[in-house]
Regions:
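Glycine-rich anion/phosphate-binding loop at the beta-strand->alpha-helix junction
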Residues: 248-285
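Metallocofactor- and cofactor-centric catalytic cores in central/energy metabolism, strongly enriched
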Residues: 1-113, 117-151, 155-159, 164-254
């Protein structure tokens, strides 16, 4: 809120927006920060601390009126996660005129977008970001899948096993662009994988994994003799993920569907291996 407006105007509009969202969508998806930033960096830090304590991993900055462009964009700058901006449309009186001649927050949104650019802050702004409580609730709901994608990428590690095969250019991933997306990469030698695979020989969990594979394959189980090897390989990858995911919450495996040392592994490596466990995606080139 600007300090030339009553703070209660923004607070009431914020409450109406949150109530509109809860009435139409999943109430567990949204948290209402009680701090109203009134042209104050101190308020901004209080709001940042509050949403961190609440465990929020995405942020919507709502301009209840023109909005203080400095502190509101600082909040987006300091928040570590996907963020969006929306703004309040002016309520109208019964005769269609603006209540007490007040304007809406479109002007503040223009200033906010300019300040975000100056700060090199990437934020999602809807095509027309000014609306009623119900309209802004719809905008937030449309942002959720975007926020999930951004959050997932920034917490993802792709574990690959090489060398990358000759004549498969698509396998030679442009790592720089993955880094730009916030994705972490761990490239390993297939010899490392082979060593880990051998260490899982005779693993006591293999029979249980084989049973799971047999159940999924059903009548399609044409080569039951290779299932123990496949189970051994699956456990190798699952343990590798647990030992190597580091600070990341999500992991995907990128490998080749046939190993360079196929005679040593005693099998090829189909991409569906980990699908039966429901643990994580494992894809080939």
């Amino acid at each position: 809120s600007r300090d030339c407006f009553p703070e209660s105007l923004s607070v009431t509009r914020r409450q109406n927006l949150v109530n509109a969202y809860k009435a139409k969508y999943n109430a567990d998806e949204i948290y209402e920060c009680p701090v109203c930033i009134v042209e104050s960096e101190i308020h901004m830090m209080q709001a940042l601390d509050d949403i961190k304590k609440a465990g929020c991993n995405a942020l919507c900055v709502y301009l209840g009126n023109f909005g203080p462009e400095i502190s509101e964009t600082m909040l987006a700058q300091y928040f570590d996660g996907p963020k969006m901006f929306v703004a309040a449309a002016e309520e109208t009186s019964e005769n269609g005129g603006l209540v007490q001649g007040r304007g809406d927050a479109y002007c503040g949104m223009l200033n906010a977008s300019y300040n975000l650019k100056l700060r090199n802050v990437k934020a999602y702004i809807p095509e027309y970001p000014v609306g009623t409580a119900e309209e802004c609730a719809d905008m937030i709901h449309e942002f959720i899948p975007v926020a999930k994608a951004v959050y997932a990428l920034s917490n993802l590690k792709i574990i690959s096993f090489g060398p990358r095969p000759t004549n498969f250019l698509a396998c030679n991933a442009p790592i720089k662009q993955l880094y730009n997306l916030g994705v972490e990469i761990e490239e390993n030698s297939e010899l490392d994988l082979f060593e880990a695979f051998n260490k899982h020989a005779g693993d006591e969990r293999i029979p249980e994994v084989v049973k799971s594979m047999e159940k999924e394959l059903g009548n399609g189980n044409k080569k039951p003799e290779i299932l123990p090897k496949l189970a051994q390989y699956e456990l190798t990858l699952l343990d590798w993920v647990e030992q190597h995911k580091g600070s990341r919450k999500f992991v995907a495996i990128a490998g080749k569907c046939w190993p360079a040392f196929q005679t040593q592994f005693g099998k090829s490596k189909p991409a569906f291996l980990l699908h039966s466990t429901g643990h994580l995606p494992a894809g080939s080139e």
